[in-house]
């Protein structure tokens, strides 16, 4: 759902970015623990983008000029089992990147964060993935949910370490 608020206290559902989950034949029945995981919403050059990880199929994206308007059909940005929690970054040099984590339940690895270059439209990963953080040090285990920013010439990747299983 897409929610709107004028005061950050009272919220109203104004739309839904997805009409149905894809692949539709797979999601024709309820699939506990599957589907949309940890979406990120970003605004870039007049459009809103939502990226999410489906731990069984990969990273998807939809976009719209108006959050209350028509959203595009889902685009598979990167096909891979176990990729979750994606967050895009459009750099000021025109390049676009995707940060993401891994679901141990699907990929047999976790606590690893990666960044990959996408095409300028943000619709496809075009470069190799690079590990930018490995939390398998028994101190910061279960690193996930990265959020990617650039401010004053510096890149920031923020994420919870230790997991989110307790809320």
Region annotations inferred by a language model:
Residues 1-167:
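Carbohydrate-active catalytic/glycan-binding domains of CAZyme proteins
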């Amino acid at each position: 759902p897409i929610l709107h608020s004028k005061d950050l206290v009272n919220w109203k559902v104004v739309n839904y970015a997805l009409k149905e989950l894809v692949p539709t034949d797979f999601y024709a029945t309820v699939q506990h623990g599957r589907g949309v995981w940890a979406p990120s919403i970003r605004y870039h050059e007049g459009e809103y983008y939502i990226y999410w990880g489906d731990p069984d199929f990969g990273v998807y994206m939809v976009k719209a000029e108006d959050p209350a308007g028509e959203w595009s059909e889902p685009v598979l940005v990167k096909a891979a089992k176990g990729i979750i929690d994606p967050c895009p970054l459009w750099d000021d040099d025109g390049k676009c990147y995707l940060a993401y984590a891994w679901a141990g339940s699907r990929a047999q690895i976790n606590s690893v964060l990666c960044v990959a270059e996408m095409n300028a439209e943000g619709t496809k990963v075009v470069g190799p993935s690079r590990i930018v953080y490995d939390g398998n040090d028994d101190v910061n285990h279960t690193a996930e949910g990265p959020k990617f920013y650039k401010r004053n010439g510096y890149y920031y990747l923020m994420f919870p370490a230790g997991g989110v299983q307790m809320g």
